[in-house]
């Protein structure tokens, strides 16, 4: 069962539960995770980290001290993992009887990875609903190649980004020109957020319809869109 915990201003800590055991993805803070574990009497088996930013790793130290879970992540977070727990493109791990595949998804950071779990993509800040993460590395080629890899996933793949950016991203897409589908999605997303809900997960199929970054025809178009979004 996949769930979420809200954290900081707009972060989601994604949770995967099975038979009293728990995996958390990108725990930006420990308090919400501890509360869930204690309230539901769960055993924290593993932490999956997509990249090094503090709003994705802030809770790791306390959670490790309190529960001693296995921590997996890319080389840029090796200070939080043991050598055997550093993962990269093409690797796979098994936790709680589930096979988890690791996909390279860099661009936002140098070694950003995503985790594919039974048709569910936990993509950190590499892909958002109707958007994409800032390219802090300046490596737009890698960020565009990440979009190409995501496009090849099955359309019914569920996508779990780490932030609630859907409304602002849809507003940007509408600034590029009229789009009835995007207008409808914006209205729905606004309603969900106003009620304190979560607009995620999305799907690869849906993103192919509303996300211009994912559907960029070439690197030049992708970079132009990202530059426009940076100034939006």
Sequence positions of predicted segments:
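Active-site HxH/HxHxD metal-binding segment of metal-dependent hydrolases
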Residues: 8, 22, 29-102
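Divalent metal-coordination and catalytic microenvironments
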Residues: 16, 26, 51, 63, ...
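Active-site metal-binding loops of divalent metal-dependent hydrolases
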Residues: 27-29, 52, 76-77, 107-109, ...
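Active-site-flanking alpha-helical
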Residues: 58-59, 114-115, 132, 170
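Active-site-adjacent loop/tail segments of enzyme domains
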Residues: 131-156
